[in-house]
Amino acid sequence: MEKKSGRSACVAVIRRACAADMEEILQLVGDVFEEEQGIPRALNPIPPENCPQWWCAEAEGRIVGAMAAFVEDGSWHVGRLAVSGAMRGRHIATGLMKTVAASIFDQGADCIYMEARDITVAIVKKLGGRVTGEPVLFYGERLTPAVLERGRFEG
């Protein structure tokens, strides 16, 4: 999909990640979370028992964005949304959220839950999601619980 903004045009292909992508995805997620947000890399892994599924955005042969979906306490969740700094402002995060949500709904989920930073909450609201509680501080930034429901999804 082509993404345009005030920056130069970029073609980012959003797709389900494969095993060969995981090293680059985990490096990107670690860099964004630790270096930009101060969240230790040790908090990034999703336990295998949560059956994580990863998607990535690829541009010019490299991974520039990623997002995971996983099952926790019997419900679908999304998280670990990361876009490289140089590629922000091109709607890659929105594309990832739309693609991941559509796939999880296709797998039978009725709701997808998340605890998200303000910018992600704005994306989720545009896609028909809603805030479900009060924000909490996590490493100095607000995390707000939100849900995206199949019947309200505008993707």
What does each model-found stretch correspond to?
Residues 113-115, 130-148:
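Conserved catalytic-core motifs of GNAT/GCN5-like acyltransferases
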